[in-house]
């Protein structure tokens, strides 16, 4: 989703991006992470120059530019073992610094969740209702 929004932000009115894998190059360079080596086949191996160049072409963090982006909500989980919480944090910080629009760019870190979001039924419903409320607000839907 991050790559699509970077390439064609005009296609989206808003973006809701959950535990996004946006710092592809840096993450895939760390072969001590549990999923890295096994996912070379999916994302590419940055230690191979040709694959590194492919990865650099789509990596959302590396392709942020000074331009307008749609309203965006990014959620991450502090205990996520698949997408480390600092990856989307770094992405949001950089995007806030360089974007040229005044659209909201919200970043929410759930300190008790992992990759699947809140684990308790009521916590998950709370998060979903918050997200839907934000979505309706951004689309000017009266509820």
State the predicted function of each range:
Residues 1-143:
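Active-site-proximal cap/loop segments of hydrolase catalytic domains
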């Amino acid at each position: 989703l991050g790559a699509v929004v970077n390439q064609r932000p005009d296609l989206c009115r808003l973006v809701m991006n959950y535990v996004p894998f946006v710092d592809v190059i840096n993450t895939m360079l760390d072969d001590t992470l549990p999923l890295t080596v096994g996912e070379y086949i999916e994302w590419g191996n940055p230690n191979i120059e040709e694959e590194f160049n492919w990865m650099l072409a789509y990596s959302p963090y590396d392709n942020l530019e000074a331009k307008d982006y749609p309203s965006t909500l990014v959620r991450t989980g502090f205990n996520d073992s698949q997408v480390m919480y600092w990856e989307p944090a770094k992405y949001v910080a950089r995007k806030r610094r360089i974007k040229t629009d005044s659209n909201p760019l919200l970043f929410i870190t759930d300190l008790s969740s992992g990759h699947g979001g809140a684990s308790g039924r009521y916590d998950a419903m709370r998060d979903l209702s918050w997200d839907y409320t934000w979505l309706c607000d951004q689309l000017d839907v009266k509820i």
